[in-house]
C-alpha cells in the first residue's frame, strides 16, 4: 500500500441497472475513476460533476459510453448517469444545472449518510472485479 486513502466509488440505483444492462463492469468504472484521479478527466463540468468515457465491452472509448460522475478527487466518486454517444450527444442546459445541483448535495453527504444509502440499496459500492478474484 502506498499510504494514500483509497477513493470510495459508488453507483446509484439507476446507473447500476444501466451498467448491468449494457455490460459495463465495475473494473471499467474503477479504471475511469483512476484516470480522473490522475488528472485525465474527459470533461470537468464544474461543481463536482465530471463526464468520463467508459469503453464498450471489447471496444474502445470513442464508441463507448459517457458517464456523469459526482467526483471529489481521491475521496469519492458516484456514477449517476450514463448514455451511449450514439444515443445522446450532450446534456442540455437544464440537465446540466440539475446534475450540478445533485452533485453538490451528494458530495456534501457524510460517510455515515453514504453508508445508510448503501444499506438502503440506493447506492452500491463499486469494487474492482479483477482484484477480487
Feature names for model-found ranges:
Residues 42-83, 87:
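Basic/aromatic recognition patch in beta-strand/loop cores that engages polyanionic ligands
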Residues 70-124, 129:
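Enriched for short, Lys/Arg-rich terminal
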Residues 8-55:
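N-terminal first-folded block
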Residues 2-3, 17, 34-38, 76, ...:
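Preference for short coil/turn "hinge" residues that link or interrupt alpha-helices
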Residues 10, 24, 63, 75, ...:
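Charged, alpha-helix-enriched surfaces in structured cytosolic catalytic cores
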Residues 1, 28-33, 56-58, 97-100:
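Polybasic/polar functional segments that serve as interface/processing modules
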